[in-house]
């Protein structure tokens, strides 16, 4: 059986990124949203976290833990067509930078997190996905989550794209 370390996401990132993901996941769980980490998207991008709510709403979270990484990120708009809501998640020291217009404060939400918890500082705008896209994304999400659970039972099944 796979070891716990083999099954965890965010194993090749700075520990602070895994801490932010953990805090966001705890917050989402309290809000009845459940996340899959490092979720591949059809456009070749990979969402740090993608969560589903009880009504099938999809939320993508992009985690940033360094100012340089945040400023250099030009790909995040590519996530918007695959979710109903989009959030940035950052440690407390980066929150101020996400007020800049280029980060669409009227559209993108902001979560500040550490390894213990997280708080929504700015709510994300709700932009409902078209029905056909929603169906495709929900199916993809479910299959990815199921595949990861199957790999827990038999590691040879892996978690390939």
Each predicted region: which residue ranges?
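Catalytic cores of nucleic-acid endonucleases
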Residues: 8, 65-113
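Short, flexible loop segments at the rims of nucleotide/cofactor-binding pockets, characterized by
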Residues: 38-40, 62-68
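Active-site beta-strand-loop-beta-strand hairpin of nuclease catalytic cores
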Residues: 43, 47-60
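Non-catalytic C-terminal interaction segments of nucleic acid-processing enzymes
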Residues: 2-33, 43, 99, 103-161
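Residues in well-ordered beta-strands of folded domains
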Residues: 36, 50, 111
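Flexible, charged surface loops at secondary-structure boundaries
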Residues: 28-30, 53-54, 80-82
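Flexible, glycine-rich phosphate/dinucleotide-binding loops
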Residues: 58, 95, 117-119
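Amphipathic coiled-coil/heptad-repeat helices and related helical stalk/stem segments
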Residues: 20, 45, 71-75
